[in-house]
Curated annotation (Swiss-Prot):
Name of the protein: 5-hydroxytryptamine receptor 2A
GO cellular component, one term: axon
SUPFAM superfamilies associated with the record: Family A G protein-coupled receptor-like
Function noted in UniProt: G-protein coupled receptor for 5-hydroxytryptamine (serotonin). Also functions as a receptor for various drugs and psychoactive substances, including mescaline, psilocybin, 1-(2,5-dimethoxy-4-iodophenyl)-2-aminopropane (DOI) and lysergic acid diethylamide (LSD). Ligand binding causes a conformation change that triggers signaling via guanine nucleotide-binding proteins (G proteins) and modulates the activity of downstream effectors.
Length: 471
């Protein structure tokens, strides 16, 4: 059936999904120019019975017809953005649950990652759905004008908080590598939460001018009906303060951390090789009178000793953690750099650049940046066994780890065995001390007998005494 985009047209065969557009684009408007309606170059539409629109437009296309032409494209955009929103919210909720419930994950770095997950989750709840709504309305602001400044404020706040968290993680790990004793002494849970509060305070301070000035002057947050930052000075300064400066600090400290870990690994290997050369030593144990032989015992310390393994293991764990964080840093930089670079280009080459092209690039790049909030939980799942196990249990609604029977047996029996072994060691120590005291008494008695025999034997009688060794 053919449908003409005119005022007096009968639209009986249009699907309900096209008729119920609400306040969005309609098939016709009252202000449609009559001369355009009377023109012979009308646009023909063919709609089949399966609610699938076959568009065959001929001649002049009024704006209302163009809006329907782009309807299918908007549906695909809405579908993709919905997938990103669901992944962002669900994945970051799993991260928050894992750090809150798993004791293995409760350390300073994972507290930062949990706070980062909170920022990403709020971005998915409060910012992304509104951004998807603007796409469906042709990047026009469909909500009350006062909410525009609030929405931009939340967008800048959570995006800035993400980069600030990554910068703080990089700095914290660098300090931990450089001063491990000082860091371990003062790196309590309270200190970690104070650092997180400082990160959020900085993020709020950077983004606060947006609602302060945007609510007073709509021209700073509106441009041609679209909700976006229109103040070039704030765009330029905010991009450097909220992204490029923290990015520089994060990259420098990360590479310094990698360099320090490599240096420590080299020193540890050389130290182990030095210990291997001085691997043997001997000592003389105590002996009783019944056994006067001297025993020698040699203990050989190999490079794989417990102390060496512990040092190498700690360095290996740090390297693995830096690898995972490096992937998170890299993905964040790759996904947000195009947006901020294009944002600065829009200010610098405002006259020479094509505004339509710049605007289209910004609309695409901002969603690529949003995608970074969804990929972090995937990175944790791929590269961290504890996160992977926790996520798998949470999806199955199992919030506590189920221990196997063998683990329960070991948990119940090992403390008793340890107690018995400690009691045995204490008994052995007491017995050895009693033997040593008895040995000393025997030695003193022998010495006293020797002295008395020497006093009584004044004649030319030679007395042969046994040599007694008490070591």
């Amino acid at each position: 059936m053919e449908i003409l985009c005119e005022d007096n047209i009968s639209l009986s065969s249009i699907p309900n999904s096209l008729m119920q557009l609400g306040d969005g684009p309609r098939l016709y408007h009252n202000d449609f120019n009559s001369r355009d309606a009377n023109t012979s170059e009308a646009s023909n539409w063919t709609i089949d019975a399966e609610n699938r629109t076959n568009l065959s437009c001929e001649g002049y296309l009024p704006p209302t017809c163009l809006s329907i032409l782009h309807l299918q494209e908007k549906n695909w955009s809405a579908l993709l953005t919905t997938v990103v929103i669901i992944l962002t919210i669900a994945g970051n909720i799993l991260v928050i649950m894992a750090v809150s419930l798993e004791k293995k994950l409760q350390n300073a770095t994972n507290y930062f990652l949990m706070s980062l997950a909170i920022a990403d989750m709020l971005l998915g709840f409060l910012v992304m759905p509104v951004s998807m709504l603007t796409i469906l309305y042709g990047y026009r602001w469909p909500l009350p004008s006062k909410l525009c400044a609030i929405w931009i404020y939340l967008d800048v706040l959570f995006s800035t908080a993400s980069i600030m968290h990554l910068c703080a993680i990089s700095l914290d790990r660098y300090v931990a590598i450089q001063n491990p004793i000082h860091h371990s002494r003062f790196n309590s849970r309270t200190k970690a939460f104070l650092k997180i509060i400082a990160v959020w305070t900085i993020s709020v301070g950077i983004s606060m001018p947006i609602p302060v000035f945007g609510l007073q002057d709509d021209s700073k947050v509106f441009k041609e009906g679209s909700c976006l930052l229109a103040d070039d000075n704030f765009v330029l300064i905010g991009s450097f303060v909220a992204f490029f400066i923290p990015l520089t600090i994060m990259v420098i400290t990360y590479f310094l951390t990698i360099k320090s870990l490599q240096k420590e690994a080299t020193l540890c290997v050389s130290d182990l090789s030095t210990r291997a050369k001085l691997a043997s030593f001997s000592f003389l144990p105590q002996s009783s009178l019944s056994s006067e032989k001297l025993f020698q015992r040699s203990i050989h310390r190999e490079p794989g000793s417990y102390a060496g393994r512990r040092t190498m293991q700690s360095i290996s764990n740090e390297q693995k953690a830096c690898k995972v964080l490096g992937i998170v840093f890299f993905l964040f930089v790759v996904m947000w750099c195009p947006f901020f670079i294009t944002n600065i280009m829009a200010v610098i080459c405002k006259e020479s650049c094509n505004e339509n092209v710049i605007g289209a690039l910004l609309n695409v790049f901002v969603w690529i940046g949003y995608l970074s909030s969804a990929v972090n939980p995937l990175v944790y799942t791929l590269f961290n066994k504890t996160y992977r196990s926790a996520f798998s249990r949470y999806i199955q609604c199992q919030y506590k780890e189920n221990r196997k029977p063998l683990q329960l047996i070991l948990v119940n029996t090992i403390p008793a065995l340890a107690y018995k072994s400690s009691q045995l060691q204490v008994g052995q120590k007491k017995n050895s001390q009693e033997d040593a005291e008895q040995t000393v008494d025997d030695c003193s008695m022998v010495t006293l007998g020797k002295q008395q025999s020497e006093e009584n034997c004044t004649d030319n009688i030679e007395t042969v005494n046994e040599k007694v060794s008490c070591v």
